[in-house]
């Protein structure tokens, strides 16, 4: 299955960057075969242009395409260590994500990527409320090796978190 794949970078700024912070963004869509202009892509482009933070943007519509995208990043991208932030833009509630009307718990996701997210920060956009107990969060971090998991306590169908997410990401460049 192919998916939307874009490398977002402003080359002039990338060449002069002191740090190697990159963002890998994975957005859930109804059908990866249908290309649509996403607000997320526009915001990542602005982040690259203004802050010099490059990113890779992909879409997924099933748990298999999510796993395939992250495995491609893990095993085929020799710069994976530079991707400090894994940015997930998908629906869900509490301890689950939703892909094409199927719900997966973060425990299931953790087990798929057991030990593979060492040192990464997983950040969820506000389209998915991140409502985890301390034990659930610690389990996810312990199993995946991730450094942190972050997100929002409320979602909004009328207002996205893109601007706040952009500010959050820019903190890693300072």
Residue ranges of predicted features:
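A domain-level signal for caspase-like cysteine endopeptidase catalytic cores
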Residues: 2-83, 121-125, 143-144
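Conserved beta-strand elements of beta-rich interaction domains across eukaryotes
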Residues: 28-31, 93, 129, 156
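Short amphipathic alpha-helical segments and helix-helix/interface helices
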Residues: 41, 45, 106-114, 134-141, ...
